[in-house]
A protein has these predicted regions:
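Helicase P-loop NTPase motor core
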Residues: 22, 26-34, 49, 110, ...
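A basic/glycine-biased coupling hinge at the interface between accessory DNA-binding modules
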Residues: 17-20, 39-221, 245-246, 266, ...
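Pre-Walker A adenine-sensing motif
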Residues: 6-14
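SF2 helicase catalytic motif II
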Residues: 215-232, 249
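Motif I (Walker A/P-loop) of helicase-class P-loop NTPases
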Residues: 31-39, 65-66, 235
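Conserved RecA-like helicase ATPase core segment
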Residues: 2, 7, 40-43, 71-72, ...
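Acidic, low-complexity intrinsically disordered tails
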Residues: 1, 535-556, 679-705
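Conserved helicase C-terminal RecA-like lobe
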Residues: 168, 366-378, 391, 398-678
Length: 705
């Protein structure tokens, strides 16, 4: 199992004498340590797969981890006493995101939290609408600020009453009041938001010893990826799951902690040593990704930050190309220059477009690069585009599914009952909402209540009751009938395809219907697959050993629900997009540095390396110095950006940049100086931006004709 590991990686895999922290520098092979350790636990140390959980932050990372573990365990047998020689039941492993694990815990323990197992999971847009309703405003920036404040409170395990008691000013008091009402509204809807998927299990484990003990006994070894990105709530959940046994391995890198703005805290690394005094720390410092020049620049930058743990990356990949820093007159010149040099570099190296990434600090920087790439007919992929599940047509179908599972989900009812149109207008829904509010019931329940006739006519009530009858029939069948049959009947009953062709032009309708069919196909495949065990087996302990070659979950790392539609619906809410379905296109990658974390590219252009952009000012005024904590996080972000590059790294900055209606003078980022690059005169940026004709002439010269 340990073939090909270096000594530090091997120690990380084999150490089982207590809590373990693997400090894994960029490109040092941390995923290999996690996957090899899972295999070591099962094949060599007698652990059953159902007692192991590995958690990470993204569906993509979890999918990669599952795939690697499946390959490692192919053909392997158990070493568990009494089960020696049996094929490893890979499908019983839990390899998932934090939120997927949270959903499984909530499904099992819903009754302890006043929830039904088919609770709804609200997305960001649903939550935005709820906050907007509480604030009674259309001020979107204000709504987002309050929404983010509520999220930070939840992630810090601050209750609404505590937020109210600690409010320092009127704005905080208003936000705390909204928080209190927001939590009550969620409970009335029998719904949770994404933050609740971690917060509620943590609070439950803290309050209920029996539940906590049950989960500690079932998940007997934990592996935590990207530990530096955990927030207070996630750390609390992990600590409660680990319990006194403290059988866990946390893998992370304090130098790559770049999510402070969403509640992640480096304090968790410090706290780990306090809460677990016997913590064993292992450092992975050999980098398998980048050249010596790239690593030297990264080490020089991050050395300016105070250190929790001393470590320094090294590589045996050779010195590599010099790192270049190119000034540009303005944004347009910068984009022209980068795209031209990328094209020339690709030709010289006989590379592919997919070998190149253009990284930037903020999404606002992407537009000009998109324009130039399109003009030059260079294919590109923009990271962070519209999620498959954010498309309106997918949200429409999801609204029906949510309502089938949970009749108390008012936002789902409003969307489903009005799409397609059924002659139920806003006036009718407002009257229904007022009636339901006074009766303190859901909209769905209010449709059937006596007294509604005093508010609405039979002509208004009958379409709503017909719709709710339809949903109830589907819900009754969803518990027992195959998911495929229920989905087909639902789609036939709502006439969604006809609605699309009525509401949109033919091309749009075709695209939207194609997306719906793809989504339904995905659901049906999950609904008809053999049941995988995952966490459900870990909790119940009643599943057989299964077959390592089949049933391995490739979506969320947890239990599928076989042919039952209801269990699939919560899985849908967790998926940010259909991962791994599209082949990696031969295209330049445009991405923020945050979105590039965990990825690598042979050749990287890091653009906009200017004061105010990298490092970003945040909320600071231009005249005020950026505070030390922000600079340290921005420096870690620069470190992440540099270490995405495998073979070459080119930096650019603008001398001037447009801001609103004025042109501002820019200074090169302090991080360029901190890289301590070889002294060399930078390329001149005094010439006018190249015309397309000049570029064509240069390319012809480069091509020898």
């Amino acid at each position: 199992m340990s073939a090909g590991l270096n000594s530090a990686q091997n120690e990380g895999v084999r150490y089982l004498d207590g809590p373990c922290l693997v400090l894994a520098g960029a490109g040092s092979g941390k995923t290999r340590v996690i996957t090899q350790k899972i295999a070591h636990l099962i094949v060599d140390k007698g652990f059953e797969p159902r007692h192991i959980a590995a958690v990470t932050f993204t569906n993509k990372a979890a999918a990669e981890m599952r795939e690697r573990v499946a390959k490692l365990l192919e053909g392997q047998t158990l070493s568990t006493p009494g089960k020696e020689g049996r094929k490893v039941p890979v499908n019983q492993l839990t390899v998932c995101t934090f939120h997927s694990l949270g959903v499984q815990i909530l499904r099992k323990e819903a009754e302890h939290l006043g929830l039904k197992p088919q609770f709804s999971i609200m997305d960001s847009d649903d939550c935005f609408a709820m906050v907007q309703e509480q604030l009674a405003t259309t001020d979107k920036p204000l709504i987002r600020r309050v929404q983010n404040t509520i999220s930070l409170w939840k992630n810090a395990l601050v209750l609404p009453e505590q937020a109210l008691a600690n409010a320092q000013n009127e704005d905080e008091h208003v936000a705390a009041m909204v928080y209190r009402n927001y939590v009550a509204t969620l409970h009335a809807y029998q719904a949770v938001d994404f933050d609740d998927l971690i917060r509620l299990p943590a609070e439950l484990f803290e309050a209920n010893e029996a539940v906590r003990d049950r989960w500690q006994n079932k998940l007997r070894y934990l592996l935590i990826d990207e530990y530096q990105d955990t927030n207070s709530c996630q750390y609390s959940l992990l600590k409660l799951l680990a319990g006194p046994r403290a059988a866990f391995t946390a893998v992370g890198d304090d130098d790559q902690a770049i999510y402070g703005w969403r509640g992640a805290t480096l304090e968790n690394l410090k706290q780990l040593q306090i809460d677990f005094p016997k913590l064993h720390v292992i450092k992975l410092e050999q980098n398998y990704r980048s050249t010596v020049r790239i690593l030297t620049a990264a080490n020089n930058v991050i050395a300016k930050n105070p250190k929790l743990f001393e470590k320094k990356l090294w590589s045996d990949h050779g010195m590599g190309d010099s790192i270049t820093v190119t000034p540009a007159n303005d944004e347009e010149h910068e984009a022209e220059s980068v795209v031209f040099r990328l094209s020339a570099h690709k030709f010289e190296r006989r590379a592919q477009f997919r070998d190149y990434a253009i990284l930037y600090r903020g999404n606002f920087q992407a537009r000009i690069f998109e324009q130039v790439l399109r003009r030059e007919r260079i294919p590109y992929v923009l990271s962070g585009g519209t999620s498959f599940f954010d498309r309106a047509e997918i949200k429409d179908i999801c609204a029906y599914l949510r309502l089938i599972a949970n009749h108390d989900d008012d936002p789902a009812l409003i969307r489903a009952i009005t799409t397609p149109k059924r002659g139920i207008g806003n006036v009718t829904l407002e009257a229904l909402g007022s009636f339901a509010g006074q009766a303190k019931v859901s909209l769905f329940e209010a449709v059937y209540m006596g007294g509604l006739e005093a508010r609405l006519s039979d002509r208004q009530i009958e379409p709503m009751r017909a719709f709710c009858d339809f949903i109830q029939r589907l819900a009754a069948r969803a518990e027992t009938d195959p998911a495929t049959t229920v989905l087909d009947d639902m789609m036939e009953g709502i006439h969604y395809e006809a609605y699309l062709y009525d509401a949109f032009d033919e091309r749009q309708a075709q695209n939207k219907w194609s997306n719906v069919l793809e989504f339904l196909d995905w659901l049906k495949k999950k609904g008809t697959r053999p049941e995988a065990a995952g966490v459900d087996a870990a909790v119940e302990g009643e599943r057989g050993d299964g077959d390592a070659a089949t049933g391995f979950d490739t979506s969320d790392g947890l239990a599928d629900t076989g042919k039952n539609l209801l269990g699939l619906i919560q899985t849908v809410a967790l998926m940010s997009m259909l991962e791994g379905r599209d082949e990696d296109p031969d295209a330049v990658r445009l991405s923020t540095v945050h979105a590039s974390k965990g990825l690598e590219y042979p050749h990287v252009f890091l653009v906009g390396c200017e004061e105010g952009i990298m490092p970003h000012r945040g909320g600071s005024d231009d005249d005020e110095p950026i505070d030390d904590a922000r600079i340290e996080e921005e420096r870690r972000l620069m470190y992440v950006a540099i270490t995405r590059a495998q073979r070459s790294l080119q930096l650019t900055y603008c001398k001037k940049r447009k801001r609103a209606r004025e042109t501002i003078v820019c200074e090169p980022s302090r991080f360029i100086q901190e890289m301590l690059l070889d002294e060399a005169p930078p390329p001149s940026a005094d010439e006018a931006p190249m015309t397309p004709k000049d570029r064509l002439a240069n390319l012809k010269a480069l091509l020898g004709g």
